[in-house]
Regions:
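Active-site anion-handling motifs in enzyme catalytic cores
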Residues: 1-361
Length: 361
C-alpha cells in the first residue's frame, strides 16, 4: 500500500508541519507496512523529520510519477481548496486530485476547510475534483459548500487532525526564551492577511490591556516562520507595553509554549486548535471564515477580538470587556474548552476511519 500526501508541507509553517506529523503517525499506526510519500517544498527536510519518502512538489514530472505510484492520494489537511490565496494555488491542489482521478487512483479530500471560492474557484473545484472518492471537512460551512459543488461523493464533517497532536513530555525552559515563568503568559500568534492593519490595532490594544491591567507577560510566537515574525514585529511597534518576539522554533517547542500559556490570542488556526487541545482559553482573531467556524464548532462564548466581516474600526470598550472577561473567567472557560477538546479529538479520528473505509473498498 502506498499513500501520497498533498498539502502545504515543507514551507516552515508549524501548523502544517503538525498536520503532517499527525497524519503520518496515524497512517503508520494503521498501515505499518505502507509506504508514505509527502509532496514538499523541502523534500530533504520532510524526509528526514518524518522518516518518509518525499517528492519535490514543484517538479511536475516527479509529482506525476508519485501519483502513478500511489494507491491512495490524500489532499490535505488544511485550507487547500480556496482561491483567497491565489488561483494558482487552487489550480495546483485541484490539479493533484484531477491527475489522481484520471489515473484511477483512490483519492480523498482529507480534513480540509473549503473556500473562500469565487465563481472561477467554484468552477475549478466542481470540474477538476469530480471523481474524488470521498471527502472529510473541518466545519459545517465547508461541508455545505463542497456538497453544492461535488454532489456525487460522500462528504463527512470531522475535525482537524491537529486535535490529535501530542506534545512531547518535558517542560519548556521559558527563561531561556526571554519569558518570565513566574508571571502569567499570554501567547500571541498573528499572520499577515487582508485587513491586518485594522486587526493589528485591536490586538495591540488587547496586548497592552493584558500587560498593564493584568500584569501578564505577552510573547509573540511566529507560527508561520519569518513572515509571521515580520507581522509580529510590525504589531509590537504599535504596542505601548513591551511584549517579546519569541525566536523561530519547531512545532514541539511551539506546542509546549501554548500548553504553558495562561491565555492565547490567535489568528493562526492551529495555534487556536492547540489551545483548545490543551484546555487554554483564547481570544480569536477571525481573519478567515475557518477561524469563525472553529469558534462556532466548540460553542465558544467569547466573540472574536476582530472579525473579517466586521467594521474596520474597533472600540476600546469592546476590547477591554473581552480581555477582562477571558482573564476573570479563565477557569470556567478552560473547563469548557477542555470538554470540547475531547469531542474534537473523536471527530479528528473520524478522518482516519473514513480513510480506512476507502482503503478497504
Amino acid at each position: 500500500m502506498q499513500f501520497l500526501l498533498s498539502g502545504y508541507y515543507g514551507f516552515g509553517n508549524l501548523g502544517d508541519e503538525a498536520l503532517a506529523r499527525v497524519i503520518v503517525s496515524e497512517l503508520r499506526a494503521r498501515y505499518p507496512y505502507a509506504e508514505i510519500n509527502v509532496l514538499s517544498a523541502r523534500p530533504e527536510v520532510t524526509a528526514h523529520e518524518l522518516a518518509v519518502r518525499s517528492t519535490p512538489r514543484a517538479q511536475l514530472s516527479a509529482v506525476r510519477d508519485a501519483i502513478a505510484g500511489a494507491d491512495v492520494v490524500l489532499s490535505g489537511g488544511g485550507g487547500l481548496l480556496q482561491n483567497a490565496t491565489s488561483l494558482r494555488s487552487l489550480l495546483y491542489y485541484a490539479g493533484i486530485l484531477r491527475a489522481a482521478n484520471r489515473a484511477q487512483r483512490k483519492s480523498m479530500i482529507f480534513a480540509q476547510s473549503i473556500g473562500p471560492l469565487d465563481f472561477v474557484g467554484k468552477t475549478v473545484v466542481r470540474e477538476w475534483c469530480k471523481g474524488t472518492s470521498c471527502a472529510t471537512v473541518r466545519d459545517a460551512r465547508s461541508q455545505q459548500l463542497l456538497s453544492s459543488l461535488l454532489r456525487d461523493i460522500r462528504i463527512e464533517r470531522t475535525a482537524d487532525p491537529v486535535f490529535l497532536y501530542d506534545t512531547p513530555n518535558g517542560a519548556i525552559d521559558l527563561p531561556s526564551l526571554g519569558v518570565d515563568g513566574a508571571v502569567p503568559l499570554v501567547v500571541v500568534a498573528v499572520r499577515k492577511s487582508p485587513g491586518f492593519q485594522h486587526a493589528a490595532r485591536a490586538i495591540a490594544y488587547a496586548v497592552d490591556r493584558f500587560s498593564e491591567k493584568h500584569h501578564a507577560h505577552v510573547a509573540f510566537l511566529p507560527f508561520g516562520g519569518s513572515d509571521d515574525a515580520d507581522a509580529a514585529t510590525e504589531l509590537i511597534r504599535k504596542c505601548k507595553s513591551s511584549p517579546v518576539l519569541l525566536p523561530l522554533t519547531n512545532i514541539d517547542e511551539a506546542s509546549a509554549l501554548i500548553r504553558s500559556a495562561f491565555i492565547v490570542i490567535g489568528m493562526r488556526l492551529h495555534a487556536l486548535i492547540l489551545a483548545i487541545r490543551y484546555g487554554i482559553p483564547f481570544l480569536a482573531v477571525a481573519y478567515d471564515p475557518k477561524v469563525s467556524a472553529l469558534c462556532e464548532d466548540i460553542g465558544y462564548p467569547l466573540s472574536p477580538l476582530w472579525k473579517y466581516t466586521s467594521a474596520r474600526s474597533f472600540t476600546a470598550r469592546d476590547v477591554d470587556v473581552l480581555v477582562d472577561r477571558v482573564w476573570e473567567e479563565r477557569e470556567a472557560l478552560a473547563s469548557a474548552v477542555a470538554a470540547h477538546a475531547e469531542q474534537m479529538r473523536r471527530l479528528a479520528q473520524r478522518n482516519f476511519e473514513v480513510l480506512d473505509e476507502l482503503v478497504r473498498a
